[in-house]
Amino acid sequence: MKYRGFGRTGWMVSEIGFGGWQIGGAWGPVDDDVSVYTLLHAFERGINFVDTAQLYGAGHSEKIIGRALREWNGDKIYVATKAQPTVWPNASDNAPAFRGRFPDWHLRENVENSLRHLGVERLDLFQLHTWAPNGHLELDWLETLNDLRREGKIDQIGVSLRDNRPGEGVDLAHLGLVSSQQVIFNLFEQQPRDALFGAAKASDTAIIARVPLDS
């Protein structure tokens, strides 16, 4: 397995990560024991980065990952999870309002739920599950997340960009307000190369590629 630095966090993460959407049961029943076995096999093969979200099976994916972490006796596994907004922005809206989608009470509730599901004392990477081009101008969400960092409940902060809208993360990357951005990038979706990747490199913001094998 090859590893690379995860932005400015100091982490060395596997170039291949484990996506936790399917083990949440989004596409039908799954065998939880098989899911745990699969995770442990991935860890044994050198994968040390797992991405999940509370949305994935209403927290079920997080719980399965938590089981695997308790059974794992090897090196550090970094787990990234996400909080969905109180209201999802309209996919066709080019400039959705961002303030109020991640209020303080909502973020704190999500952090506590993820801590409980994963069975950990601190979340490695806590991400917003959507974004908007004006999000860097409405920083109520960041104030709360920085408070949670100071409280020791989360380590790093990230965002997951909306589908096929990598340009919405460029200003955020230039400012370096978060440690990572998650974006669709594969053979068919190359837009992040236009501006986002350069901005992220300049601020040492890590990039997580979504659906890299999309077909």
Regions found by a protein language model. Name each.
Residues 1-77:
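N-terminal binding-site loop/beta-alpha segment at the start of enzyme catalytic domains
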Residues 7-10, 44, 67-78, 115-119, ...:
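Acidic (Asp/Glu)-rich catalytic clusters
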Residues 12, 22, 26, 89-96, ...:
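Glycine-rich, positively charged active-site loop/lid region within alpha/beta enzyme cores that binds
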Residues 13-17, 48-49, 76-80, 122-127, ...:
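Structural preference for beta-strand elements that scaffold enzyme active sites
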Residues 21-33, 92-108, 130-134:
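Active-site mouth loops of central-metabolism enzymes
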Residues 29-42, 101-118, 162-172:
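Short, acidic/polar
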Residues 115-134:
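Active-site groove signature of glycoside hydrolases
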Residues 130-215:
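Beta/alpha (TIM)-barrel catalytic core signal, keyed to glycine-rich beta->alpha loops juxtaposed to Asp/Glu
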